[in-house]
Amino acid sequence: MGSHSIGSEEGAVVAAETQSLYERLGGVYAIAVVVDDFIDRIMVDPRLNANPRVDEAHHRVSAQGFKYYVTEQVCWAAGGPQTYSGRTMLDAHRELLITGAEWGAFIDDFHQTLAKFGVPERERAELDAIIESTKDDIVTPAAPAV
């Protein structure tokens, strides 16, 4: 017989099921490490920087400040105690004219970062849903063909 009873295993399962995404990701420090890698990755991605507006923004905005706001936003969206204090996604991205292909590159970078840190599938799916909820405010709709 092992050192754990069935009751304690059931308790562990129940605790894991009731924890917020924020808690399951390890809290602000773990989230900040992942965001740090992700922002470093997107700041130099040639697929994103091919858009001159994005490239200019990447050179105008402090990477450290960008990392702060993204960390704050992820923590807030994942159920942490933080409150996002940055601009709306629409206001922050409206002038960048981000295309669907650039969104795809951004998502690819995001998935590479999650894989690097071994983020489990359940948490990846929840993070994907959070990111996907911002797409309509970030991607500029294509102009209709004339």
Give residue ranges: language-model regions.
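Core of compact, soluble alpha-helical bundle domains
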Residues: 2-146
